């Protein structure tokens, strides 16, 4: 379904590329937005959950009598009450070696992580439901807990009886002659990296409101989600609701970042409760619940090894990615969403490495399940690749820019060892731009002067490539069979105004603005005459979800195709009205005009009026109507690229690290709206700073989460947001009509690696290197004293033999 990317005549970029103010902002910033918790319906009841206080325990008894008898309580359910409706939910995405697991809606017999839903209570108010939850008696017999994925995967205590070996996923692959690369290597560098466990922590937590109308057998579900059509499918797949009689509505959503790209047990229970009670039921989680049970992200143990020649040219890479997957697979992605992407997609990155071998494993543990979060899989993989590249630079005694230049891909199209084609890119240009922006020689002088004064500055860089526009073609290129496609409807009325209905909903990305910009240029009409419904209801256009940096590419592609179909009809009628050939008609600035005869023109509004009301203006064989629904699904993956450089100042006494400035270079093809793109860069990088320096979901030895509020879980605030300098490079994609690529995840993909590299650069006078995030003050102070908590494996063979990979020919560490 790829669209032709050349138009005849060419479409003028009048609105695309402009800093058009976001049309949705006035409504949202003045408090006129309508989020999930703003929506109420007559007669609604409120739901709360009794959640497991234990990480792993046998349920020996549940006493709900007192809660059931409490005034105002309408329903108290345990797993026994819902078995007749649903056996549980399962993930659908495919990945080699992924083992099926069922997540119960309410824990049955065994609880497997702190925060797992055990009992549902529905009452006339939230307060009453919470009070009733306190009256539920829960008797547990504690079982052995496994929290470390390294112990779990090696036969530790069984975390989930469905997977007695604790393996949620395991796979391997090899491309090129990896053994030869390592046998002939002049240098081998290796390291183990551990990005910590983090939360997406959207400003708006999860929630839903189910309204089942029993007289018509119809369900309406409002839900804070990134994937409303997937939620609708799950209502049918797991609960038996008729899709044709179900509507899922996604209202204004206060952030998602991947966490809301799942279906959760709570979201399936509300429709069941509403159907049972014949009244609406609402559930909105509090922050503690969100941090306990809203899916976790990014924690992996990534072991990576480079083989390099005498000049530092990398000839082979081996990667082992072990994810702490938690107690279950999260639908739809499974725990493969982290380890598979880290191992299979990221090890070569922007570098021309001819041979690659990888193993990915997902360990089942007694923690909240692992889910998607901005940069999923890419963040950990980029951290390992880019940090080890700095290790190689130190070994070769060259700058971090130079070592990357020696290895970067320079000619396109380029095919990586896995067979994935990169049609275009600006990999070298990004490295050069970053070095120029930071003025590297000047920084080195300033760093030296600061050290003499007892201050420690560090520079960290990270360059990346990001697959964007998640599509069926992209999944097929990586060996998966999952289907992604979307549709959009574009309708022009008789006055020339346009309404767009997109299948992709927004969580603050600015879809209403960017999609209108795309249509404005295709149709040649003012931006202000276009309104956009961005996926608010499944009654409209279809969407596979606002995930994977796909909105501008996929939703934009759908709008582009539908608008272009309208454009062709406008051109046909305008040519007839102006007595010209269609090839000579240009649509621009609200007018249809003849090339070379500016005075010969007619307003597009008049052309639209003729289409609707005056058949005398039609050419022969013309069919009425100015409304089209078009689908879009790119046949091959496309990639944006870029890089970030951070300068930090490190205090060796307190261990505090301050980010002084961020330099960002982004190539996402043709930029629709620079202001929106830069907002995405800033937001993603600041999230990366949080992950790099202080965000961490911490468990104690019993499996209790210690960070259950924003007092403990430290998200970045404006006081840690540094100044930015941003530069754009435009390498248009040959896969899209407008040349656009996706970029929403790039900041969090790359920034944590830049943070770690900057901290390690600042630590270099102390002879220490950190391999673990976050780089907390405690870890930094210990590093200044030569104490490093995380050490790489001394025997690599066990990592590979576990998955059937031969032991390495070279030693694990070759660092000077």
From Swiss-Prot:
Q: What is its EC number?
A: 1.5.99.4
Activity regulation here?
Nicotine dehydrogenase activity is inhibited by tungsten.
Q: What SUPFAM superfamilies does the database record attribute to this sequence?
A: CO dehydrogenase molybdoprotein N-domain-like, Molybdenum cofactor-binding domain
Pfam family example for this protein?
Answer: MoCoBD_1
Any GO MF annotation of the entry: nicotine dehydrogenase activity
Q: What is its main location?
A: cytoplasm
Its function, per the record, reads: Component of the nicotine 6-hydroxylase, which is involved in the degradation of nicotine. Catalyzes the hydroxylation of the pyridine ring at C6 to form 6-hydroxynicotine. Can use both L-nicotine and D-nicotine.
The name under which this protein is listed is Nicotine 6-hydroxylase large subunit
State the organism of origin.
Answer: Paenarthrobacter nicotinovorans
């Amino acid at each position: 379904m790829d669209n032709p990317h050349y138009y005849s005549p060419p479409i003028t970029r009048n609105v695309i590329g402009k800093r058009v103010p976001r049309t949705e902002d006035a409504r949202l910033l003045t408090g006129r937005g309508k989020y999930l918790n703003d929506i109420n319906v007559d007669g609604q009841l409120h739901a709360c959950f009794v959640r497991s206080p234990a990480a792993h325990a046998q349920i020996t008894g549940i006493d709900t009598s007192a809660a059931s008898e409490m005034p105002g309580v309408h329903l108290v359910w345990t797993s026994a009450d819902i078995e007749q409706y649903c056996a549980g939910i399962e993930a659908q995405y495919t990945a080699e070696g992924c083992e099926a697991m069922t997540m119960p809606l309410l824990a049955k017999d065994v609880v497997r992580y702190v925060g797992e839903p055990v009992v549902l209570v529905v009452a006339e108010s939230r307060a009453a439901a919470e009070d009733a939850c306190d009256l539920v008696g829960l008797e547990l017999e504690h079982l052995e807990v496994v929290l470390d994925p390294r112990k779990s995967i090696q036969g530790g205590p069984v975390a989930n009886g469905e997977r007695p070996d604790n393996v949620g996923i395991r796979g391997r692959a090899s491309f090129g002659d990896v053994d030869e690369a390592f046998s002939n290597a002049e240098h081998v560098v290796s390291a183990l990296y551990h990005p910590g466990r983090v939360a997406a922590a959207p400003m708006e937590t999860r929630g839903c409101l189910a309204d089942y109308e029993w007289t018509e057998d119809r369900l309406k579900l409002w839900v804070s989600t990134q994937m409303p059509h997937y939620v609708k499918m799950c209502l049918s797949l797991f609960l038996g609701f008729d899709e044709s009689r179900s509507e899922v509505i996604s209202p204004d959503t206060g952030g998602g970042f991947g966490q809301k790209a799942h279906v959760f047990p709570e979201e399936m229970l509300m429709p069941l409760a509403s159907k049972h009670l014949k009244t609406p039921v609402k559930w909105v989680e509090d922050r503690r619940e969100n941090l306990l049970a809203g899916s976790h992200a990014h924690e992996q143990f990534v072991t990576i090894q480079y083989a390099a020649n005498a000049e530092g040219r990398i000839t082979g890479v081996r990667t082992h990615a072990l994810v702490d997957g938690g107690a279950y697979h999260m639908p739809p992605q499974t725990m493969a969403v982290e380890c598979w992407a880290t191992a299979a997609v990221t090890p070569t990155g922007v570098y021309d490495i001819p041979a690659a071998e990888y193993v990915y494993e997902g360990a089942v543990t007694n923690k909240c399940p692992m889910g998607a979060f901005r940069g999923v899989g890419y963040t950990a993989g980029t951290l390992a690749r880019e940090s080890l590249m700095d290790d190689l630079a130190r070994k070769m005694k060259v700058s971090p820019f130079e070592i990357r230049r020696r290895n970067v891909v320079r000619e396109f199209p380029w095919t990586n060892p896995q067979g994935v084609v990169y049609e275009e890119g600006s990999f070298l240009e990004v490295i050069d731009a970053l070095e120029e922006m930071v003025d590297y020689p000047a920084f080195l002088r300033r760093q030296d002067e600061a050290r003499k004064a007892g201050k420690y500055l560090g520079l960290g860089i990270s360059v990346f490539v990001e697959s964007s526009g998640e599509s069926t073609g992209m999944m097929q290129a990586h060996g998966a069979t999952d289907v992604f496609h979307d549709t959009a409807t574009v309708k022009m009325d008789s006055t020339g105004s346009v309404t767009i209905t997109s299948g992709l909903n927004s969580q603050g990305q600015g879809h209403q603005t960017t999609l209108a910009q795309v249509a404005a240029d295709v149709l040649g009409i003012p931006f202000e005459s276009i309104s956009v419904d961005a996926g608010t209801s499944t009654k409209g256009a279809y969407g596979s979800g606002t995930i994977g940096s796909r909105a501008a590419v996929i939703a934009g592609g759908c709008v582009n195709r539908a608008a272009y179909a309208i454009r062709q009809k406008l051109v046909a009628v305008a040519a007839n009205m102006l007595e010209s050939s269609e090839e000579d008609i240009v649509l621009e600035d609200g007018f249809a005009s003849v090339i070379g005869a500016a005075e010969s023109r007619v307003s597009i509004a008049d052309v639209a009026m003729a289409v609707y009301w005056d058949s005398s203006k039609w050419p022969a064989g013309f069919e009425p109507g100015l409304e089209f629904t078009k689908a879009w699904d790119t046949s091959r993956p496309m990639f944006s690229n870029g890089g970030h450089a951070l300068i930090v100042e490190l205090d060796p006494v307190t261990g505090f690290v301050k980010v002084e400035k961020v330099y960002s270079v982004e190539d996402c093809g043709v930029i629709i709206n620079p202001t929106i793109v830069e907002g995405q860069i800033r937001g993603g990088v600041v999230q990366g700073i949080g992950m790099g320096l202080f965000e961490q979901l911490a468990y104690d030895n019993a499996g209790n989460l210690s960070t259950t509020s924003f007092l403990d879980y430290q998200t970045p605030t404006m006081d840690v947001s540094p100044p930015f300098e941003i530069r754009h490079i435009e390498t248009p994609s040959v896969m899209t009509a407008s040349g656009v690529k996706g970029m929403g995840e790039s900041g969090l993909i790359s920034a944590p690696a830049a943070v770690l590299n900057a901290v390690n650069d600042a630590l270099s006078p102390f002879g220490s290197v950190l391999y673990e995030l976050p780089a907390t003050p405690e870890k930094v102070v210990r590093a200044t004293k030569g104490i490093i908590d995380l050490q790489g494996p001394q025997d690599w063979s066990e990592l590979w033999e576990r998955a059937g990979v031969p032991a390495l020919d070279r030693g694990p560490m070759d660092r000077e």
